[in-house]
Amino acid sequence: MGLGRPDDRGGPRHTGSAAHRGHIDDLERQLRGYGLTVTRHPTRLAQWLAQRWSLQVTDAGGTAWTVPVASYRPRSGETGPAGVTGPVVDLGPGDEAAYQAAAGAGAGGAAAPLTGAVVVVDAPIARLHASVLTDLAYAVHPPTARAEFAQEDYSRVWLGVPPAPDLATARSHGAVAMIEISDQSPALAAGQYTPHQQEHAGLPALRLDRESGARLRALLARGPARATLVLTADRRETTVDYLLARLPGAGPPGARAGAVLVATHTDGQNAVEENGGPALCALAEYFSRFPASTRSRDLLFMFSPNHMTADGATVKPDAWLRAHPEITAGVEMALVAEHLGTLGWDDQGGTGPYRATGRTEPVAVAVGNSDTLRTLADDEVRTSRLTRAGIQKPFQNGLYGEGTFAYRLGIPTIAMITGPAYLLQVAPGGNLDKLDRALLHRHTVFLARLLHRMMELPGDIPR
């Protein structure tokens, strides 16, 4: 089975961007070339694409400093080309008590000190271990991996634990912008597109790494300072396309067993998030080599376009599928793939330099709505000798990423996913250096074997 180059042509595929739309076009061309029937389905998108961002601080002595910015906060808000300028107020943890304390400084008739301010707040990251995965696993392969995971750093900004600083609170107190200080090394903080699914908040925000944050606070220690924060963005109402591709099985549609939905998403920041598209194309190419008589089920490949945006900005796959019963009526189960072939990188829980760990990333093979599929997935993980893998339980009405949507519709679902520290990172070269091509191939072969076994299951599988 061949696998196309998992490259990052065109840069990050932010939702609705030219690079993203070009990627969807590429996938369509490949799938049509394999003989699949391909359809496109536009859905609404409140598009938000950052254009320019910068931070300049003028200290108490009147000296202007350009402060390096690690990243912008997606859909936080936007400024005009000149940005917004205001006094800098350091709120430390940024909790309600900090806001109240700052507001109290303006009591007695003085103007509220936060009105028109650029607030500075901490953006901590929970220091977790990979045992957060094994704690939710039916089984771990090999069993010795449980002990490894218990010692392995799993501090991940994409988990959103604790939640990102509250922009609405800052705005309600009169702030005009926010500067977040992340507890991450410069190399890891750079380009982190987080939180990746927040609603538009109307308050522009930028994020600094721990070193730039320390330098900023050193400037503030000299006395009152002012900041000019720039975050311009292209914000518009538009559409973006779901992509469906069908590979039919044998016999008339009414006589075939239910279809297998094979899904991923097309938007993402790098060659890992999302490389499910090339993997699904490899599966489509492989199964299209064989006559329809060898397939007892249709394969329906779905590429959703809106993983990296807020629920209110688009129509997510569960709602979209619910609105298309002509599609879901024929689907009996689902297989979802995301973030394959990933290598481990971390900064030792914030205590050291950002570097390769020498390990592969833990793999979650999550299963929902079917004991039959759980048994099948567990057996195939063993048979394929997939390592550092957990057979995961559903969690918080979800199935670890894109698999959540089929799961919420009650469809028996298997979802394969990893979650490296660089998952949401926009980086030079698209983080291709953190992708192991041989491992990517092994993961894709595992999916092909698993999909073949799912196709061979009798109709109306027990749940």
Predicted segments, located by residue:
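Stable alpha-helical elements in mature extracytoplasmic
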Residues: 1-6, 19-30, 162-166, 171, ...
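Soluble metallo-hydrolase cores and metallopeptidase-like ectodomains found primarily
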Residues: 70-105, 193-274, 282-285, 289-290
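Noncatalytic luminal/extracellular "stalk/propeptide" segments of secretory-pathway proteins
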Residues: 2-145
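Active-site-adjacent substrate-binding region
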Residues: 154, 167, 171, 340-463
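Acidic/histidine-rich catalytic neighborhood of metal-dependent amide-processing enzymes
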Residues: 268-368
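Second-shell loop/turn segments in exported
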Residues: 8-21, 75, 86-90, 100-103, ...
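Structural recognition of the beta-strand scaffold that forms the well-ordered cores
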Residues: 2, 40, 118-122, 176-181, ...
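Catalytic-core environment of secreted peptidases
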Residues: 1-20, 26-35, 118-148, 156-158, ...
